[in-house]
Amino acid sequence: MVELRPVTEENFFDCIDLDVKDQQQDFIPENVCSLAEAYIALTSGDLVPMPYGVYDAEQNVLVGFVILSYSEEGDEELPEPYYCVWRIMTDANCQKLGYGRAAMEKLIEMAKEQPMGPAKKLCAVYTADNKAAAALFADVGMNAGKPDSEGNVLAVMDI
């Protein structure tokens, strides 16, 4: 149903033109900001971001944008290397058609293949009031913790 294609100079502008619904604007930064943050994370050595356009494989149409990241060092909450769904969004015009779940399934498959290095966990962070993200991550088997002091929730699954 969906195919993840790396963000390149050919699809860069199409990816940054994607947008979520008005009521979702507070939950996720614009894709151009996400790509800038990915560049900074990569050049600073913090983690390895892997940005992709999400395409409807049958219609060859861009429907969303994701970033899967890899942290070799781990951190306080996940002390071992891990993969993270750093960003996932479906364009406002393409929501409620199964693209988000299909993209998550592709990201899980990719993390299990361990393209950037070994890891035992896949995580995602979302704000506690983002019910759509909570439902999506729970639906694919991620276990959510309690919101932190800033209202962010860490969802984790074994891979």
Description of each model-found segment:
Residues V156-I159:
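Short beta-strand-to-coil "C-cap" segments at the C-terminal boundary of structured domains/repeats
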Residues A138-D148:
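Conserved acetyl-CoA-binding loop of GNAT-fold acetyltransferases
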Residues L122-A134:
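Conserved beta-strand-loop-alpha-helix junction that forms the acyl-donor binding cleft
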Residues V2, P6-W86, D91-N93, M110-Q114, ...:
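Acetyl-CoA-dependent GNAT
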Residues T90, K96-M110, A135, D139:
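Conserved acetyl-CoA-binding loop-helix of GNAT-fold acetyltransferases
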Residues N130, S149-V153:
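Short acidic/glycine-enriched loop/turn segments that link adjacent beta-strands
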Residues E113-V125:
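Conserved GNAT acetyl-CoA-binding A-motif
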